[in-house]
């Protein structure tokens, strides 16, 4: 179940937001950052969210690697990307699964409030056997290829 961001919440795993809610958080709060926790192959070949119109950049930190294996330095790399304690973070993956783990781990490390973006960048697989049902791209939010 999705929960609406609440500014009175203490830092921590704050739950889920849909792509539109994440976009609105990024628009309205200059402190909110996006961490895309997909793999480099996904960023390169599928595309990425484009926050340039907001004067922001996406932090790209892989949760796991293309050939398998978790990124043991994930939290350290999130911090190296400039994410600070107390700063709202929206985590994005392909379909909203890896980003849950990323948000929870960030919370355990003292970062956040941390949100998982439901549906992710590409969303669920539809009847067409393509990821064309929901997600950041399908909802028409800014993105770019390559």
Predicted features along the sequence, with ranges:
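Short, surface-exposed ligand- or partner-binding patches at beta-edge/loop junctions that are enriched
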Residues: 91-92
